[in-house]
Amino acid sequence: PKSRIEWIIIDDGTDKIEDLIESSNIPQIKYFKYDEKMSLGRKRNLMHTKTTGAFIVYMDDDDYYPPTRIEHAVKMLQTHPKALCAGSSIIHVHFKHIGKIVEFGPYGPNHGTAGTFAFRREMIENSTYDNDACLAEEKHFLKNYTVPFVQLDPRQTILVFSHDHNTFDKRKLLDN
C-alpha cells in the first residue's frame, strides 16, 4: 500500500524543492537538502543510510517511472528470492532533440542501469557505490556484475530522458 512507501529525497540541486515537499502534506517523504553538489555514488550511498524498508526502489528525479514501477520491482524480488537486486539491462531513452525514443541493451543478465534498480536491504548491508563515481556506478555496486540479479520489464521500469543537465550526455549513445 502507498502508505507504506517511504520516499527519500536527497536534494543537492541549485533550485531546492523544500517548499513543494512541505506543501505536499505527505508524511512518508523524508527530505534532506545539501548545499554541496554530490557525485552519484556518494548521493546513492547517503540515501541508503536514510532508508528503513526491506526493499529499496530507485526513482531518479529526471526520468519517468510508470505507475507499476514499485509494484513490479517488489513482486519480481519476491518471486525470485535468491536475487538481491532487480533492474533492467534494456532502457528506453527519449531524445527530445530528435523527437524519438531509442532502445539500448540488453547488456547482460546481471546488468542493469542504476536508475532501474530495486533491491533487498541485504544488498546495502554488503555493498556500496564508489563515492567518487559520477557515471557507470553500477559495476562497483553489483560487484562486477556478480550479484544475484533478476531482470525487470523495461516498459514497467523507466523511460530515461536525455537533456542538457544529465550527468552523462546520453546523446553520445546515439553514436554507437
Where are these predicted regions, by residue range?
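Short, acidic, metal-binding catalytic loop of nucleotide-sugar glycosyltransferases
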Residues: P1-R4
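Glycine-rich, basic loop-to-helix element that forms the pyrophosphate-binding segment
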Residues: Y34-T51
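Conserved nucleotide-sugar donor-binding
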Residues: T52-G53, H111-S127
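Short aromatic/hydrophobic "clamp" motif used to bind/position activated sugar donors
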Residues: I56
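The conserved acidic donor/metal-binding loop of glycosyltransferases
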Residues: D60-Y64
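Conserved donor NDP-sugar-binding/catalytic core segment of glycosyltransferases
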Residues: R69-K100
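A recurrent flexible, glycine/aromatic-enriched loop bordering the glycosyltransferase active site
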Residues: L84-A86, I98-F119
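Acidic donor-binding loop at a coil-to-helix junction in glycosyltransferase catalytic cores
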Residues: A133-F141
